Amino acid sequence: SFFELTECPDSIAILGGGAVGCELAQVMGRLGSKVHLFEAADTLLPAEEDFVSRTLQSSLEKEGVVVHAGDRVERIEDGRTIISQSGSYECHKILVALGRQPNTEGLGLSALGVKCDAVGHPLIDSKLRTTNKKIYAIGDCTGHYQFTHFADGQARALVQNALFANTAKVSSEKTPRSTYTQPEVAAVGASTQMLDQQREAYETYEYFFDELDRVKVGKLSEGAHREDHGFVRVLVKRGGDQILGATIIGPNAGDDIAPLVVMM
């Protein structure tokens, strides 16, 4: 396992440009490894806003991480050589960070009347009930946001619904998510890509943190770049004040997203 390594490898290939892949790519680069980060999609963190992907990739590349966005890995040879669409890359270690799949096969769920999707995620409603209303499912196996805090929220709702009044609901739309890179990334709700696909009418409000006086002083003393100070985008339902989604990139983004979650 990756977390059982006792020495920092000279080079490492990381497959997957999601939150875990980006976080560990930056960590390993700072520890001294030559890092190759592969993502089949055109951008890192493909589920997030485009400005997040651009800013994060730029930051990683400034630190020496070689980012292979839009470069699908075709195979691995000898446990050390990555063969991708762009070429061949030899690394001392390879980390696969391509997400999780449910381990539900063989549980006999179909015999219990529990339906699953094609991948094996049990189908659940807003109260966490499967298609067998006496059986609940929570956590990563459901295929929803695979975050510790989301599973915790599901567990609290499960206790309420299974043992007491069946009234608790869990909404992934109001569950925040963070990626602990530098700059830090945090988001909640929908992105512009999602709303465009849904043809939802919305208005966009944006703000660069370096427009704040406090940041301007820090910028003069530290000589940092503008994108390092942060940027926020808030999406609001057109003609109203309902927040549909928000994204922040910058220092303490995971903390700064909290008021927006409350407002939603």
Where are these regions (language model features)?
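Glycine/Thr-rich phosphate-binding loops of Rossmann-like dinucleotide-binding domains
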Residues: 23-24, 45, 103-106, 145, ...
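A Rossmann-like FAD-binding core segment of flavoenzymes
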Residues: 31-126, 190, 197, 201, ...
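Rossmann-like dinucleotide-binding cores of NAD(P)H-dependent redox enzymes
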Residues: 3-4, 9-13, 19-78, 145-152, ...
